[in-house]
Amino acid sequence: MPKARVTKNETAPVSSNPSANRTPVKINSAGTPMWYKVIMFAFMIVGLAWLIINYLVGPQIPFMADLGAWNYGIGFGLMIIGLLMTMGWR
């Protein structure tokens, strides 16, 4: 019977220690600072509050009435900033 082909992996020496073949990776366990989380959630909550206040009493508040439809851009913009900050949260 013909002999099967020998692959590269079969001829490579096998280490008795499986962790010897791995490259050590340094893990930063510090996480995100507290101020980052506070600002991130503050952006999202202030944006939501802006939209709710605009919907409920926007025409009665002079500067919000002057902004008109820009209130939606401000509210959603603040929430999007908070959402984008979640990508840096560890």
Swiss-Prot record:
- Name the record gives this protein: Cell division protein CrgA
Top-level division of the source organism's lineage: Bacteria
Subcellular location(s) of the protein: Cell membrane
The UniProt annotation puts the region (Disordered) at 1-25
What GO terms describe the biological role, i.e. biological process, of this protein? cell division
Organism for this UniProt entry: Corynebacterium glutamicum (strain ATCC 13032 / DSM 20300 / JCM 1318 / BCRC 11384 / CCUG 27702 / LMG 3730 / NBRC 12168 / NCIMB 10025 / NRRL B-2784 / 534)
Does the entry feature the keyword Magnesium, yes or no?
no
Keyword ATP-binding belongs to the record? no
> Which Gene Ontology cellular component terms are annotated?
plasma membrane
Q: What is the gene called?
A: crgA
Ranges annotated as biased composition (Polar residues): 9-22
Main location group = membrane
What's this protein's family per the entry? Answer: Belongs to the CrgA family.
Q: Which UniProt keywords apply?
A: Cell cycle, Cell division, Cell membrane, Membrane, Transmembrane, Transmembrane helix
Spell out where the chain crosses the membrane: 38-58, 67-87
